[in-house]
A protein has these predicted regions:
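Phosphate/nucleotide-binding beta-alpha loop and adjacent structural elements of enzyme active sites
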Residues: 1-207
Length: 207
């Protein structure tokens, strides 16, 4: 995370009821989350089966789902990168220019899932979201639209240009989230046209 979770908690008085983390990778944020919330109130979602099994081994008992999430159910090709963290349903755009050492080494076919079909399996009030799925964040959010009016906080990777082909740009995310009263209050950019942003429910500002 480019923006410190602990700094966000202090600055915005974040209260965690439940966390949905999409793009688990190896659950690197788990220790930070556990300062505020227990594992039974966290749901992780990860597209790579090998990473899901690794997380289950490292952190027995966590809630984790193996799923490729999007805004509609369809068959897709999921691209796997040599660094793991750049894997995506989207093709590289400017990513290849800024990170020439990273490339896709294999791919597999899979069927996408809507988050709204996963979330009811768990007794969690998901008020804090963390999305890091390489340009597909808006697609995933649209797949759980029914839940967004009860979300208080969203931490997400964002793009100012097409780091991945046809990825959502930050202005599109801003416009979409505004209709759910989620307002961007923090942004931290890298030099490679991508970064992290933090959105908060408007009525929680200045509380």
């Amino acid at each position: 995370m480019l923006i410190s979770l602990h700094e966000l908690v202090k600055k915005y008085n974040i209260i965690f009821n439940g966390i949905l983390h999409v793009g688990a990778h190896e659950c690197e944020e788990l220790n930070d989350y556990n300062k505020y919330i227990t594992n039974d109130k966290i749901l992780w979602v990860e597209a790579l089966p090998g990473k899901v099994e690794l997380c289950k081994t490292k952190f027995p008992g966590i809630n984790i789902e193996n799923a490729i999430v999007s805004d509609k159910i369809e068959n897709v090709v999921f691209n796997v990168s040599n660094n793991g963290q750049s894997s995506s349903i989207l093709e590289f755009g400017l990513h290849s220019q800024y990170h020439p050492h990273v490339h896709y080494i294999t791919a597999f076919e899979g069927t996408t899932t809507l988050l709204k079909d996963i979330l009811p399996k768990y007794n969690i009030n998901y008020n804090f979201l963390n999305f890091d799925i390489q340009g597909a964040e808006l697609k995933a959010l649209k797949g759980m639209e029914e839940y967004l009016n009860t979300v208080d906080y969203l931490y997400t990777e964002v793009n100012s240009d097409y780091v991945y082909k046809n990825c959502a740009l930050i202005t599109e995310l801003d416009d979409y989230l505004k209709q759910f009263s989620l307002i961007r209050v923090e942004t931290n950019w890298t030099d490679c046209k991508w970064g992290d942003a933090f959105y908060i429910r408007e009525n929680l500002l200045n509380k």
